[in-house]
């Protein structure tokens, strides 16, 4: 959910250690969202597989030693891709998030949790009250709703609910 340049320190250090590093701007990130309007998608394997298709064609890339690292929301996205993209031999998830929606809902204040159970109108009304008192909450919600291609905070939580690896994590073959 950031620009690739934000994690340049990772790639610089990988290169110093003899690794190849490929940094891309995927849906929900950088120019993909800002210029092309491509929001995040929960089925990240559909983003990663074409990238791996290109990577294995690059000179010097060992197709038996391809890894994927995901930071922040990538802590869900990278393992999701690894479930389906079997050419990935290593997957780093920081933080490793099994169920993004659940992890968000657990952190909600009781007032918001109760409103969520009541439905979209109640939840969005409570969120609007919070936004009015916090520039940080307002920015986070505007940014997240936009990057995930939804219209409301309630829809954002529903979108996060799609990001669930509970029944899929056992299928990851990457280390």
List each model region and its residues.
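Conserved alpha/beta-hydrolase
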Residues: 14-32
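Helix-rich cap/lid subdomain of alpha/beta-hydrolase
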Residues: 100-142
């Amino acid at each position: 959910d950031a620009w690739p340049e934000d994690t340049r320190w990772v790639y610089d250090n990988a290169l110093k250690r003899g690794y190849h590093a490929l940094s891309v701007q995927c849906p929900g990130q950088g120019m993909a969202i800002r210029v092309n309007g491509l929001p995040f998608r929960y089925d990240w394997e559909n983003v990663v597989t074409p990238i791996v298709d290109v990577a294995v064609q690059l000179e010097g890339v060992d197709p038996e030693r391809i890894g994927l690292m995901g930071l922040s929301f990538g802590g869900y996205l990278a393992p999701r891709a690894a479930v389906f993209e079997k050419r990935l031999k290593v997957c780093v998830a920081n933080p490793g998030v099994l169920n993004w929606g659940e992890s968000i809902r657990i952190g909600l204040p009781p007032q918001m949790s109760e409103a969520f159970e009541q439905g979209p109108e109640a939840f969005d009304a409570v969120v609007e009250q919070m936004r009015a008192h916090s520039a940080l909450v307002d920015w986070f919600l505007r940014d997240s709703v936009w990057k995930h291609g939804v219209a409301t905070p309630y829809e954002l939580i529903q979108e996060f609910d799609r990001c669930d690896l509970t029944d899929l994590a056992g299928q990851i073959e990457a280390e």
